[in-house]
A protein has these predicted regions:
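Phosphate/oxyanion-binding loops and surfaces in catalytic or ligand/nucleic-acid-binding neighborhoods
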Residues: 44, 90, 94-97, 107, ...
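Flexible juxtamembrane loops connecting transmembrane helices in multi-pass membrane enzymes
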Residues: 39-43, 56-95, 106, 125-129
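Interfacial juxtamembrane loops and adjacent helix segments
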Residues: 101-143
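Alpha-helical membrane-protein architecture signal
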Residues: 84, 97, 131-139, 177-180
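A juxtamembrane structural motif centered on a specific transmembrane helix
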Residues: 166-171, 203-228
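Alpha-helical transmembrane segments of multi-pass inner-membrane proteins
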Residues: 1-51, 55-70, 143, 147-166, ...
Length: 228
């Protein structure tokens, strides 16, 4: 009976996953498509890790998909390239600690104007706009908190990978892949402007670190503090 129940859960989960994939493709969300493709790339390499041709074929397909996503909405992609170029110039002016929270919205237009003063009117000139986010969460961290902030994010990622490898299980694998998907999506969009993303990320972190969280709360000092 338990086996039948688990099989039913797998079927339902597979059906929901299939519906989500179709919905993402139909929505033409390039960041979503790349996230799904990256997870598929990881799963294929885990299943056929001993076959080198699978790795090369997966890399080729991923590169073709990336190129296809660019040409799908070329003007939009070029607009983001302009935003990233101007954002990199902002990072160069305050690389270690960043410009502070809200700096992109406050100062981006100045850097965009400087870019066109330096390079003149080019293919990006028709795509220039007043934007409120760099369309890349990692670039956003660099702008707000500099390399110090980015190093803290990388330290957290390293810690989560360690926690996953130390106590691997199906539940943690799902949480880990969910975070990878969010991480890939964050390269191309403003993922963390939505509360839902924060909630999912927080839950995944709890799942990955639950053994260590349990140790913290079973520590005598913490227990006595809570009791007080």
């Amino acid at each position: 009976l338990l086996s039948d129940s688990n099989k039913y859960i797998r079927y339902v989960g597979g059906l929901i996953g299939f519906v989500i994939v179709i919905a993402v493709i139909l929505s033409q969300s390039r960041a979503g498509i790349m996230s799904i493709a990256f997870i598929c790339f990881i799963l294929l390499n885990m299943k056929f890790f001993h076959k080198r041709w699978v790795k090369y074929l997966s890399l080729l397909c991923f590169a073709l998909l990336l190129s296809g996503c660019y040409w799908m909405k070329k003007d939009s992609a070029d607009g983001r390239l302009l935003i990233w170029r101007c954002s990199v110039s902002m990072v160069k002016d305050a690389p270690w600690l960043g410009h502070g929270i809200g700096s992109f919205e406050a100062r981006y237009m100045d850097y965009q104007a400087d870019y066109f003063r330096q390079y003149g009117l080019n293919r990006y000139s028709m795509l220039a706009d007043n934007v409120k986010h760099p369309f890349n969460e990692y670039l956003g961290v660099l702008l707000n908190f500099g390399f110090v902030g980015l190093l803290m994010i990388l330290a957290l990622i390293t810690l989560l990978i360690y926690c996953y490898k130390k106590h691997p299980c199906a539940e943690k694998r799902i949480a880990f892949y969910s975070l990878i998907s969010i991480g890939v999506f964050s390269f191309f969009s403003y993922t963390f402007t939505y509360p839902f993303t924060w909630i999912v990320t927080f839950l995944c972190i709890i799942i990955l670190t639950k053994e260590y969280i349990a140790k913290v709360f079973t520590c005598p000092i913490i227990k006595n503090t809570v009791c007080i």
